[in-house]
């Protein structure tokens, strides 16, 4: 994968009716970066991801996804370079089998059948879905449907992967598998932008934190700084920030993949 900047938002303004959601927001996500997009409910996180995928269009400013302006374009115009996991996976599942769902994108892009089969088998295996390949997605439990939608987003090896709450409802093993495939994609040079309330997952898979507050980016720094590893980072203490943003899975330090992701996320006061 090349060094083309996968995502650029410049002075973006967007709202629904009279309600301004983003106001002059600018953000760049470079190749190979893993960015955690954090913020309270209603901060505009999902709106930002929809702008990046041309599901919405800025009212002012511009959005450039993998070198292409999103203005006047549709999501399918970016299917060959970007993958998107909706917060609600049912919004993107339509095929009669898991295999057909995951194969749809590559087939639409004109891949030869052997290449499609190889890519689909690979991603289904990586996410533990191989035994579900012939099942109807809606016969599967909600967390497994999320994995199917993620497989469809990953199968084309996108340059930009956008995830909206990728670990919601997943068990320990599934969280580890998701982490592994995201890290592998980043190692190939892809950028990952993840909306998440699971700070434990973010700490293991992502390395940069962008916080949305007041309709724009208010903090942009290494995730380790946000976690309290840098004395000069002007952020509230970790737990105070976590409670305010509704984060879960908080730990006092970044550990290794297996211990953190195989521990159940902390809930209670840290929930939004």
Specify the residue positions occupied by each region the protein language model found:
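ABC ATPase C-loop
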Residues: 153-154
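ABC ATPase nucleotide-binding domains
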Residues: 228-272
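H-loop/switch region of ABC-family ATPase nucleotide-binding domains
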Residues: 196-197
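Conserved ABC ATPase "signature" region
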Residues: 114-132
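Helix-to-loop junction immediately C-terminal to a conserved catalytic motif
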Residues: 53
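The feature captures the beta-strand-to-loop junction immediately N-terminal to the Walker
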Residues: 38-40
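Conserved ABC transporter NBD signature motif
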Residues: 61-69, 78
């Amino acid at each position: 994968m090349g060094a083309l900047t996968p995502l650029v938002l410049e002075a973006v303004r967007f709202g629904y009716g009279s309600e301004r959601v983003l106001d002059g927001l600018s953000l760049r996500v470079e190749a190979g970066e893993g960015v955690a997009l954090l913020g309270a409910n209603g901060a505009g996180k999902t709106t930002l991801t929809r702008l990046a995928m041309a599901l919405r269009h800025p009212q002012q400013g511009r959005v450039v996804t993998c070198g292409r302006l999103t203005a006047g374009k549709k999501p399918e115009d970016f299917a060959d370079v970007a993958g998107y996991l909706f917060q609600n996976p049912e919004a993107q599942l339509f095929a009669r089998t898991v295999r057909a769902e995951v194969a749809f994108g590559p087939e639409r892009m004109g891949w030869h059948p052997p290449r499609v089969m190889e890519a689909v088998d690979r991603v289904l295996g990586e996410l533990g879905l191989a035994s579900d390949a012939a099942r109807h997605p809606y016969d599967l439990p909600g967390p497994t449907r999320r994995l199917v939608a993620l497989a469809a987003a990953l199968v084309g090896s996108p340059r930009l992967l956008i995830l909206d709450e990728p670990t919601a409802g997943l068990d320990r093993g599934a969280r580890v598998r998701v982490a592994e495939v995201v890290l592998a994609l980043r190692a190939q040079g892809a950028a990952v932008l993840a909306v998440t309330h699971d700070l434990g997952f973010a700490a293991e898979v992502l390395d940069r934190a962008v916080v949305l507050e007041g309709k724009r980016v208010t903090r942009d720094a290494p995730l380790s700084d946000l976690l309290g590893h840098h004395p000069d980072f002007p952020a509230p203490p970790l737990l105070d920030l976590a409670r305010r943003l509704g984060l879960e899975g908080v730990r006092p330090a970044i550990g290794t993949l297996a211990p953190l992701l195989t521990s159940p996320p902390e809930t209670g006061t840290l929930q939004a």
